[in-house]
Amino acid sequence: MNLYIPKLGTKIVLTKDWSFTLIAEGRNKTLWDLLSSTPLPVRPWGIPFNRYNRPKLHRTLRKGSVLKFDRIYIRKEQGQHDSVTFKAEVRHTGVWYKVRFWVKLEDANNIEFERVN
């Protein structure tokens, strides 16, 4: 196995279906609203940000989906915040939608892909 850290803007195509956890958070709104039957939940008034247990969806993007690296966030001793943000065009009910979403680094590390030139 070779270490691969992509440049931002790099595109990859999924070579296998990829399952991941989508967390209810504003930056995931476009994909959440597309893949969920309910709108993105809002943190209830009075609950501190760090105590709010955000709802999650377990979803799968299909083989052949193209993802573009938009942001990679990794901080020393802050592993709970490590994440990768993608831009993608997702087909849903026969229509293509442009979305931007982030996933935890652990989920991103499970992607099987090929680089797009």
Roles of regions detected by a PLM:
Residues 15, 23, 70, 89-91, ...:
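A structural detector for beta-sheet-dominated domains
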Residues 6-8, 61-63, 80:
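Solvent-exposed loop and beta-edge segments used for protein-protein assembly and interaction
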Residues 27, 71-73, 103-109:
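A short, sequence-level motif marking secondary-structure junctions
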Residues 12, 67-69, 86-88, 113:
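Hydrophobic beta-strand residues in large extracellular and virion-surface proteins
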Residues 90-117:
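Intrinsically disordered, low-complexity, charged/polar segments
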Residues 52-73:
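Conserved beta-strand/loop element in small beta-rich adapter and peptidoglycan-binding domains
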Residues 74-89:
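Short aromatic-glycine-enriched beta-strand elements
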Residues 1-52, 114-117:
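SH3-family beta-barrel domains
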